[in-house]
């Protein structure tokens, strides 16, 4: 399967400029119905706000956005660009604006809606959905850190570490990295340790350092 990126969880932000408050929300969604339910909930919660601008982007290529009364092109599209730059899909962003009495101009609105969306996505984090190889390797304590580093270098994640007479590292690796990891473990341990495949799984795994 092809990998893709989604928000890890719901994320929120607040951006203030000249007394206008911009409240950002980013959530993972899997359909237009889910996205529109989020929009409806935000409009209900912030019914007294001047604007509830939104955008969503789905894996099937569906893109929708609304400036909700702001000047055309100053809200929905800049928010959508945040998702595009991050390579994120199956995601919705709603930015609610409480007007502070001072006009921000086109440039100010572009900056505000972009910042609110980017900060909310950074708070949500980004996960990669792909097929992973689940594996285990038992190693002497002295080689634990090098093995852990090898997992990270190949784009994998350590899910669990078990401590006994030896250290057992339970990891998820991109399926195409399995052979390379096995070779690195053999080299690191001079052939004393081997990788044990446990199976394959499709799941979302948070990316390290995914804050924007």
Regions found by a protein language model. Give the residues of each.
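C-terminal regulatory domains involved in ligand/effector binding and gene-expression control
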Residues: 1-73, 178, 183, 194-212
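A common structural junction motif
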Residues: 46-49, 154-159, 186-194
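Positively charged, aromatic-enriched nucleic acid-contacting surfaces
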Residues: 61, 71-88, 163-165
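Active-site beta-strand/loop microenvironment that shapes enzyme catalytic pockets
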Residues: 78-123
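Short glycine-/aliphatic-rich beta-strand segments at the starts of folded cytosolic domains
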Residues: 125-143
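Short amphipathic alpha-helix segments
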Residues: 138-156
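Short amphipathic alpha-helices in soluble, non-transmembrane regions
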Residues: 147-153, 180-189
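Terminal, non-globular segments
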Residues: 171-174, 178
């Amino acid at each position: 399967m092809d990998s893709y990126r989604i928000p890890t969880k719901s994320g929120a932000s607040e951006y203030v400029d000249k007394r206008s408050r911009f409240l950002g929300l980013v959530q993972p969604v899997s359909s237009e119905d889910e996205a529109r339910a989020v929009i409806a909930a935000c409009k209900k919660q912030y019914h007294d706000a001047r604007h509830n601008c939104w955008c969503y982007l789905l894996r099937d290529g569906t893109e929708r956005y609304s400036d909700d009364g702001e000047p055309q092109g100053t809200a929905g599209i800049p928010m959508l660009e945040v998702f595009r730059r991050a390579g994120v899909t199956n995601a919705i962003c709603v930015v609610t604006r409480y007007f502070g009495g001072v006009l921000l101009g086109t440039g100010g609105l572009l900056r505000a809606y972009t910042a609110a969306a980017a900060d909310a996505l950074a708070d949500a984090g980004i996960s990669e959905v792909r097929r992973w190889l689940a594996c285990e390797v038992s190693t002497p304590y002295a080689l634990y850190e090098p093995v852990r580093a090898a997992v990270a270098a190949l784009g994998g994640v350590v899910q669990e570490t078990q401590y006994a007479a030896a250290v057992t590292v339970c990891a998820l690796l991109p399926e195409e990295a399995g052979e390379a990891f096995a070779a690195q473990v053999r080299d690191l341990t001079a052939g004393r340790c081997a990788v044990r495949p446990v199976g394959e799984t499709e799941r979302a795994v948070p990316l390290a350092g995914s804050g924007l």
